Amino acid sequence: MEIVQNFSSAALTTGILLGCLGVIFLPSIVYAAFLLGAVFFCLAGIYVLLHADFVAAAQVLVYVGAINVLILFAIMLVNPQDAPPRALDSPPLIPGIACIGLLGVLVQMISTTSWLTPPWTPEPNSLPVLGGHLFSDCLLAFEVMSLVLLVALVGAIVLARREPVERSS
C-alpha cells in the first residue's frame, strides 16, 4: 500500500510541477488557464492522499469549479488579441536580484530544515475539529470573508446588468 501512495504522490507532484511550468511558459492564456485547473485537481489529489477528503472536495468545488471558471470567463470577456509581446524598456535587474535573493533564502531554509520527522497518523474524522476552529477561533475572519464575497457578488451583478449608454452626436 505504501508503494501505491509513494507512486501516487510522485505522479501528483510531477503533475503539479509540469502544470505550473505550463502556466508560466505557454504563450496561450487559455491553455494556461486549463493547466491551472489541472494543477488544482492534482493538489486535491494530494489532499486525498493526506486523508483530508473534505479539503480535497472544497479544493475542487471552490478552485476548479469557481475560481478557474471565473478566470476562463474573464479571458473570454476580455478577448485577448494575439499581439506580439512588448520588448522590455530596461534590463530586468531588479527582478533578477529579487529572484537571486529568494533562491538564497530557499537554499538556506532547505539546508537548515530537519527533514526527519516522527511518523504522523491523521485523525480518522477531522471535519468536526475543522468546523470547531472555523466557527470559534476564526469566526471573525470567516464572517469578514463572507461579507467580502457578498459585496463582490453584488458588484458583479451590478456590472453585468448595466445598460450601455447611448451617445448622441
Curated annotation (Swiss-Prot):
Gene field: ndhG
Quaternary structure note: NDH is composed of at least 16 different subunits, 5 of which are encoded in the nucleus.
Key words, A-Z: Chloroplast, Membrane, NAD, NADP, Plastid, Plastoquinone, Quinone, Thylakoid, Translocase, Transmembrane, Transmembrane helix, Transport
Reaction catalysed by this enzyme: a plastoquinone + NADH + (n+1) H(+)(in) = a plastoquinol + NAD(+) + n H(+)(out); a plastoquinone + NADPH + (n+1) H(+)(in) = a plastoquinol + NADP(+) + n H(+)(out)
UniProt source species: Nephroselmis olivacea (Green alga)
Protein name per Swiss-Prot or TrEMBL: NAD(P)H-quinone oxidoreductase subunit 6, chloroplastic
Molecular functions (GO terms): NADH dehydrogenase (ubiquinone) activity; quinone binding
Cited function: NDH shuttles electrons from NAD(P)H:plastoquinone, via FMN and iron-sulfur (Fe-S) centers, to quinones in the photosynthetic chain and possibly in a chloroplast respiratory chain. The immediate electron acceptor for the enzyme in this species is believed to be plastoquinone. Couples the redox reaction to proton translocation, and thus conserves the redox energy in a proton gradient.
Cell location: Plastid, Chloroplast thylakoid membrane
Keyword Plastid applies: yes
Residue ranges of the TM segments: 7-27, 29-49, 58-78, 90-110, 139-159
Membrane topology: Multi-pass membrane protein
